[in-house]
Amino acid sequence: MAAFSVHILGCGSALPTTHHHPSSQVIDLRDKLYMIDCGEGVQRQFRHEKLHFGRLIHIFISHLHGDHCFGLPGFISTLGLLGRTGTLHVHGPEGIERFLSPILEQFCHRMPYQVEIHTIDASRHALVHEDKSVKVYSIPLSHRIPAVGYLFEEKCRARHLNKAAAEFYNIPLAEYPLIIEGSDYTTPDGRIIPNRHLTTPGTPPRRYAYCSDTEFCPSIVPIIQGVDLLYHEATFMEEDWARAKETFHSTAKEAAEIARQAGAKRLLIGHYSGRYKDVQGLLEEAQSVFKPTIAANERMRIDL
């Protein structure tokens, strides 16, 4: 099975601390890298993780609060210094172009590569990117400004060819792609061979959902139903529930409740408030509702 892993580059929130970096993650799927959010200092974290800059083609920004996007100017500049030539695609909600275009014009106008900016409607659940390896869907979140989560779903073959059966029926190689996609096969004498006799079920696609920043938002549950791993912000503990509501963030308990309702296989919490020196309390609070919870930490890698 191809690699599908999530690297945590930063899991802190807006206030800088000595414990955590601002939000950023990298998904490694079939030798391609996809970044989600780009907090300050992300280049250093990228090197710590021994990730290859050239394998990154797409960056997905959740919203335009600084702890999620202030790393973009430096990261984009670094790619230019490294001699990048391939286009970099930056996806984000309304305002991403107003934020990034003046910076590119002022500081990055002589770079050896292009940056393409793609604006996402944060109010809609939609397919926002597709390539040979993955489909990426937007997840409408509820925050103080437009915010969007992302659902990554790997692309798998719908069916696996039973080569012994294909050879038995003398099926031409040219017919294999259609059979793998689910078609029956008609022999030269007109006999129909059902697809189920020629294939076996495909591997279910692995799915990863990133939901930050957001207040408690049950409307996302149908979108993320059954995901293999859910990252959900857990900025506060329940004892600070009033502050969570005031700032449109979630508590660890609320993050766990979303995971429970969605039937997620595992929950990864992060985006910790700087008021907590130790995240153990957040982890225990989440685990009291949803046992398979992991507390994110820098340089952590989670395999799906």
Swiss-Prot record:
SUPFAM superfamilies: Metallo-hydrolase/oxidoreductase. Signal peptide: none annotated. It catalyses: Endonucleolytic cleavage of RNA, removing extra 3' nucleotides from tRNA precursor, generating 3' termini of tRNAs. A 3'-hydroxy group is left at the tRNA terminus and a 5'-phosphoryl group is left at the trailer molecule. Keywords: Endonuclease, Hydrolase, Metal-binding, Nuclease, tRNA processing, Zinc. Its cofactor is Zn(2+). One of its GO terms (molecular function) is zinc ion binding. The active site is at D67 (proton acceptor). Zn(2+) 1 binds at H63, H65, H143, D213. InterPro entries: Metallo-B-lactamas (IPR001279), RibonucZ/Hydroxyglut_hydro (IPR036866), RNase_Z/BN (IPR013471). Binds 2 Zn(2+) ions. The keyword Nuclease applies. It comes from the Bacteria. Zn(2+) 2 binds at D67, H68, D213, H271. Gene3D superfamilies: Ribonuclease Z/Hydroxyacylglutathione hydrolase-like. Its EC number is 3.1.26.11. Homodimer. Belongs to the RNase Z family. Zinc phosphodiesterase, which displays some tRNA 3'-processing endonuclease activity. Probably involved in tRNA maturation, by removing a 3'-trailer from precursor tRNA. This is Ribonuclease Z. It comes from Porphyromonas gingivalis (strain ATCC 33277 / DSM 20709 / CIP 103683 / JCM 12257 / NCTC 11834 / 2561). The gene is rnz.
